[in-house]
């Protein structure tokens, strides 16, 4: 009776095949984007928000959506082509989305704007901004002509990164009557305060702002302009989660986002 010989090489190839199959399956599971906006929905909502007065420079914007696993699901821009916005803001928008998703919970929401003061030297989260680095191979992969399109090279991959100024917001929707954290939105391209305003209005248009309690004003994830100099002229946030006021003349004289674009199910 002849027993076929199985070489070590054959066993190795089989094992590698199993590993790749398993990894591929996990990637597909992580990449499920059914509960977050697609490219068309993001682009429409982002454009509507950018077209409003937001206290910045009126610049064109980048926007990125990630799912709860941190996988990029959509990247879009508001200008006529990919060069109409700051090119560097594409990756920053993805970094903001990753941050808002990574540090929000089903029962606690944090925006990137909320993190600014906490990560300063002496702050309770100092050093957070150096964790979870950006995956550069994903960030800069081409072709560049696909940037901001439905087939943007970041889509389907985890970007990583931590950003600690305005423009990143977690996304919550109702699934089977339960409030569910489904991912996050990141916006970049203007002042950090305008980025937050545009992200907030984009999330409002998408009707994904049924948020739980947060550390910002009125227990939300809104931006808090509560930084002022202490006795030694050092900037200090009264509540510990403050963000610099980029344009006091605008932000101090206009209605709060909580008034103009309240959180919760839209009427």
What residues fall within each predicted segment?
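Bacterial N-terminal signal peptides that target proteins for export
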Residues: 1-11
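Short beta-strand/loop turn elements enriched in aromatics
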Residues: 3, 15, 149-150
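Bacterial N-terminal signal peptides
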Residues: 10-21
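Signal peptide processing junction and immediate N-terminal pro/mature segment
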Residues: 21-27
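Flexible, solvent-exposed loop/hinge segments and secondary-structure transition points
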Residues: 28-267
């Amino acid at each position: 009776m002849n027993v076929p010989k199985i070489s070590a090489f054959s066993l190795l190839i089989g094992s590698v095949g199993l590993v790749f199959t398993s990894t591929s399956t996990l990637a597909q599971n992580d990449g499920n984007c059914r509960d977050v906006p697609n490219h068309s929905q993001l682009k429409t909502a982002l454009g509507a928000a950018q077209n409003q007065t937001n206290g910045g420079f009126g610049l064109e914007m980048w926007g990125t959506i990630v799912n709860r696993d941190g996988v990029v699901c959509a990247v879009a821009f508001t200008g006529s082509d990919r060069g109409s916005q700051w090119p560097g803001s594409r990756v920053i928008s993805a970094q903001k989305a990753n941050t808002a998703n990574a540090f929000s919970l089903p029962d606690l929401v944090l925006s990137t704007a909320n993190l600014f003061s906490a990560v300063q030297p002496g702050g309770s989260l100092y050093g957070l901004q150096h964790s979870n680095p950006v995956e550069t191979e994903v960030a800069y992969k081409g072709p560049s002509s696909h940037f901001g399109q439905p087939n943007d090279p970041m889509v389907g991959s985890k970007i990583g990164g931590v950003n600690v100024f305005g423009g990143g917001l977690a996304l919550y929707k109702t699934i089977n009557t339960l409030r569910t954290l489904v991912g996050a939105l990141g916006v970049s391209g203007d002042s950090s305060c305008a980025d937050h305003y545009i992200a907030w209005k984009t999330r409002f248009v998408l009707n994904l702002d049924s948020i739980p309690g947060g550390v910002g004003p009125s227990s939300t994830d809104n931006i808090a302009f509560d930084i002022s100099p202490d006795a030694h002229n050092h900037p200090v946030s009264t509540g510990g989660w403050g963000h610099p006021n980029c344009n006091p003349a605008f932000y101090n004289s206009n209605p709060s986002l909580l008034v103009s674009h309240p959180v919760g199910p839209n009427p």
